[in-house]
Amino acid sequence: TSIYTCYEGVGLPVDPLQGCHYYVTSQTCGFVPLLPIEVMKDRCCRELAAISSNCRCEGLRVFIDRAFPPSQSQGGGPPQPPLAPRCPTEVKRDFARTLALPGQCNLPTIHGGPYCVFP
């Protein structure tokens, strides 16, 4: 499978990794989550595990760009959760890039190990 077969509806679910949004935000923005952190992490990791290893990095990229667009730090993008109105977007983007790593979901990717290479 190449990256060209990893897009929403083909290789990726539509609107991938939505279960990761509040997990990422809770881990980066310093507020107490509504659910136990282990529950949110497990849900996020299950959603990431459901994506084939060849498409996991692309799934993370799509999720990050949609959930935490770079323009959000300049006031654009979708509204943030009310509990984290001043949380920097780049902090959330950086944390979300680590979701495949051993300290998080520890899932293999197209690169052969539990990591992604992002531009």
UniProtKB/Swiss-Prot annotation:
Thermal dependence summary for this entry: Optimum temperature is 25 degrees Celsius.
SUPFAM superfamilies from the UniProt entry: Bifunctional inhibitor/lipid-transfer protein/seed storage 2S albumin
GO molecular function, one term: serine-type endopeptidase inhibitor activity
Activity dependence on pH, as recorded: Optimum pH range is 7.0-9.0.
Residues annotated as transmembrane: none
Subcellular location(s) of the protein: Secreted
PROSITE patterns registered for this protein in UniProt: CEREAL_TRYP_AMYL_INH
Pfam families recorded: Tryp_alpha_amyl
Protein's name according to its UniProt entry: Chymotrypsin inhibitor WCI
GO cellular component: extracellular region
Chief localisation class: secreted
Role, per record: Inhibits bovine, insect and wheat chymotrypsins. Inhibits bovine chymotrypsin with Ki of 0.6 nM. Does not inhibit human or wheat alpha-amylases, bovine pancreatic trypsin, or trypsin-like activity isolated from wheat.
Disulfide bonds: C6-C55, C20-C44, C29-C87, C45-C105, C57-C116
Native source species: Triticum aestivum (Wheat)
Record family assignment: Belongs to the protease inhibitor I6 (cereal trypsin/alpha-amylase inhibitor) family.
